[in-house]
Amino acid sequence: MSSIYKALAGKSKDNKSEKKQGNVKQFMNKQRTLLISSRGVNYRHRHLIQDLSGLLPHSRKEPKLDTKKDLQQLNEIAELYNCNNVLFFEARKHQDLYLWLSKPPNGPTIKFYIQNLHTMDELNFTGNCLKGSRPVLSFDQRFESSPHYQLIKELLVHNFGVPPNARKSKPFIDHVMSFSIVDDKIWVRTYEISHSTKNKEEYEDGEEDISLVEIGPRFVMTVILILEGSFGGPKIYENKQYVSPNVVRAQIKQQAAEEAKSRAEAAVERKIKRRENVLAADPLSNDALFK
């Protein structure tokens, strides 16, 4: 009996050791993104945030932030909801949209200016993807050309890359998010991975034609600056070629004012020229002789 007991006890110890070895914690990519906007967003900005919320199942959408000055509150909100990424959309003058990409609590933070914005409702593309599916992130080769682009790529991966087994995500990969650099601007596009076959035999043999069909939304981001901390800290990069939309609008208004001024001056010159070119009265004309 003692030998049987020892054999069974040895087996139980072996099973416990195997369970302990099997219960070793594996690395899990726990990324959660906070989607939040400021006051003053218009309907197009709101539709863009809604589209991104549908494409990012690991995100949490929150109501608008009341302040635009004290952005440090976003770190507390992210900590409250266990989010380690923040996408903050800041609206100015009901027409300009800025995107703050941050990694709380230690940073860094990247500020973008968004232009050429088109939502899914505007585009009406034929592409579609499963809600909650994970994307394939495609980056341009120029993201490896400079250190600040490498940092931007890393933050884009953390914010737009849906980790496996994420909240509300489905185990499918059926769309691609493309980030390309053209004219020092980041162009964002979303495509569906479409599979098509001519007949059942090709489908069974795995001979499928794979193509990309655009879904939307599409927009262009211009880098403004990069901060070392999360919504604060020293400035580690600044885009010297960035021109504020306020400056652009002021230049357009100034050009229109100069054109209006030149038109008014030309009209005055025409009136003066007409007065100067009036013919003098002929003393031998019928009007002068037969009054």
Swiss-Prot record:
Residue span(s) of domain Brix: 31-232
GO cellular component: nucleolus; preribosome, large subunit precursor
Superkingdom of source: Eukaryota
GO molecular-function terms, A-Z: 5S rRNA binding; RNA binding; rRNA primary transcript binding
Signal peptide start and end residues: none
InterPro entries for this protein: Brix, BRX1
Keyword set, alphabetical order: Nucleus, Phosphoprotein, Ribosome biogenesis
Nucleus among keywords: yes
Subcellular location field: Nucleus, Nucleolus
One GO process term, biological-process aspect: endonucleolytic cleavage in ITS1 upstream of 5.8S rRNA from tricistronic rRNA transcript (SSU-rRNA, 5.8S rRNA, LSU-rRNA)
SMART domains, A to Z: Brix (SM00879)
Positions where Phosphoserine occurs in the chain: 285
Extra remark beyond the main annotation: Present with 13200 molecules/cell in log phase SD medium.
Assembly notes: Part of a complex that includes BRX1, RPF1, RPF2 and SSF1 or SSF2.
Protein role: Required for biogenesis of the 60S ribosomal subunit.
UniProt record similarity statement: Belongs to the BRX1 family.
Protein name: Ribosome biogenesis protein BRX1
Source organism per UniProt: Saccharomyces cerevisiae (strain ATCC 204508 / S288c) (Baker's yeast)
Organism phylogeny: Eukaryota, Fungi, Dikarya, Ascomycota, Saccharomycotina
Gene: BRX1
